[in-house]
Amino acid sequence: MSIDPANDSKLAPEANDATLGDVDRWIEQLKKCEPLSEADVEMLCDKAREVLCQENNVQPVRNPVTVCGDIHGQFHDLMELFKIGGDVPDMNYLFMGDYVDRGYHSVETVSLLVAMKLRYPNRITILRGNHESRQITQVYGFYDECLRKYGSANVWKHFTNLFDYFPLTALIEDRIFCLHGGLSPSIDSLDHVRTLDRVQEVPHEGPMCDLLWSDPDDRCGWGISPRGAGYTFGQDISETFNHANGLSLTARAHQLVMEGFNWAHDGDVVTIFSAPNYCYRCGNQAAILEVDDTMNQVFLQFDPAPREGEPVIARRTPDYFL
């Protein structure tokens, strides 16, 4: 699945004010888990916005590609993911949201992924998760981390403004539909997703909210979500949606699964979770999904990266996660 990066060696044309050298320097700095300066974050977000605003609500993605679930600020595990799956730009990646909150290094994690997007716009796709929102990040850690590392909320504002431009979903070779959460009773076609106005804070209800918050369920039909946003949807719903839209699979993230991936709805839906030992205590494996150039699918599972300088937390499984 290695790809010759020669055709993607130039910086996104919209990002010419940030030189190739600038962005390469940012990436190397971030790979050492060293946060960028506030001024560099501002420039990064300004230039990344110019790239992301050109992308679609249903962003087309070519194979081969590696599909990833939640990261949640677990920076060293993101480095492990690239070690297992291959580095950018040698491999194509599709991340399905939730880069921030809960982990210790949300700033470095989201900065690196956005810098990679700016440097190699055709090699990496970054979708929006329910945690890429102003309201959620004020509760679950990213806001506080920005205050602690920068002394003000400016970096948080730069990133949360940028989150409004992240694509909502992606479509691999017209066959695999990828999104953070799940389906919506308001949406029966990909064309409907394409018409949504995504450049806004994640709403509390409605189709955009549902795409980022919903979960598959064993019960048929639509159900009330215990999360307080989105819906649960049954096998009948996903089967109908996939068939109506010519899809072979809906891939999503959003839920902790102990093996890193979990099939549901008789193979119509798969959940991918890419944060091993979630919250540094859950004991789960992580996984990524490799889709090759013939659309064959292989899951790669991985364990946490060795930890340095982080507190050891006794493992326990919380009752519920957002």
UniProtKB/Swiss-Prot annotation:
Pfam family, one: Metallophos
Leucine methyl ester PTM positions: L322
Note: Retarded cell growth is produced by disruption of ppa2.
Organism listed in the record: Schizosaccharomyces pombe (strain 972 / ATCC 24843)
Protein name: Major serine/threonine-protein phosphatase PP2A-2 catalytic subunit
Catalytic activity: O-phospho-L-seryl-[protein] + H2O = L-seryl-[protein] + phosphate; O-phospho-L-threonyl-[protein] + H2O = L-threonyl-[protein] + phosphate
Cellular component, GO, one term: chromosome, centromeric region
Annotated cofactor note: Binds 2 manganese ions per subunit.
EC number: 3.1.3.16
A GO molecular-function descriptor: metal ion binding
UniProt KW Cell cycle keyword: yes
Gene Ontology biological-process annotations: cell division; meiotic centromeric cohesion protection in anaphase I; mitotic cell cycle; negative regulation of G2/M transition of mitotic cell cycle; negative regulation of induction of conjugation with cellular fusion; regulation of septation initiation signaling
UniProt keyword terms in alphabetical order: Cell cycle, Cell division, Hydrolase, Manganese, Metal-binding, Methylation, Mitosis, Protein phosphatase
Chain sites annotated for binding Mn(2+) 2: D98, N130, H180, H254
Positions contributing to Mn(2+) 1 binding: D70, H72, D98
Reported cofactor(s): Mn(2+)
